[in-house]
Amino acid sequence: QNWAKFQEKHIPNTSNINCNTIMDKSIYIVGGQCKERNTFIISSATTVKAICSGASTNRNVLSTTRFQLNTCIRSATAPRPCPYNSRTETNVICVKCENRLPVHFAGIGRC
């Protein structure tokens, strides 16, 4: 995965996330199945990108900034469109950095 895909998957252009709508996009369908969960970072790409600015090697980095997060969690195994629940929180995030760019969302609260 690269920075462009990371942005597409995790940095929406809106703060108003409707999990049932957004998670039906093809990027969240894996092998014909709905993705179990996905976390959206409600922030600018520039702010998220800054997490990796000091990462000289390819590794996981914990942000010093707390981000507003919206996690969509599949609530049932059903045919598309799959039903999702939404969980919002504010916390630090862990991302995998490659070439000083976030490429993978690794976790919430710790690395």
UniProtKB/Swiss-Prot annotation:
**Keyword Secreted belongs to the record:** yes
Q: Name one GO molecular function term.
A: nucleic acid binding
The places in or outside the cell where this protein is found are: Secreted
Keywords, comma-separated and alphabetical = Disulfide bond, Endonuclease, Hydrolase, Lectin, Nuclease, Pyrrolidone carboxylic acid, Secreted
The UniProt annotation places substrate binding at 5, 35-39
Example GO biological process: defense response to Gram-positive bacterium
Describe the function of this protein: The S-lectins in frog eggs may be involved in the fertilization and development of the frog embryo. This lectin preferentially agglutinate a large variety of tumor cells, but it does not agglutinate non-transformed cells and erythrocytes.
Q: Which domain of life is it from?
A: Eukaryota
Hydrolase found in the keyword field? yes
Family, according to the entry, reads as follows: Belongs to the pancreatic ribonuclease family.
Quote the InterPro entries the UniProt record gives. RNaseA, RNaseA-like_dom_sf, RNaseA_AS, RNaseA_domain
Pyrrolidone carboxylic acid PTM positions read 1
Q: Which GO CC terms are listed, alphabetically?
A: extracellular region
Main location, first listed in the record: secreted
**Active site residues according to the UniProt entry:** 10 (proton acceptor), 104 (proton donor)
- Name the SUPFAM superfamilies on file: RNase A-like
**What does the record give as EC number?**
3.1.27.-
Originating species? Rana japonica
Protein's UniProt name? Sialic acid-binding lectin
Lineage summary: Eukaryota, Metazoa, Chordata, Craniata, Vertebrata
Q: What's a Pfam family this protein contains? A: RnaseA
Q: How does it assemble?
A: Monomer.
Give each disulfide bond as a residue pair.
19-72, 34-82, 52-97, 94-111
Which EC class heads this enzyme's classification? hydrolase
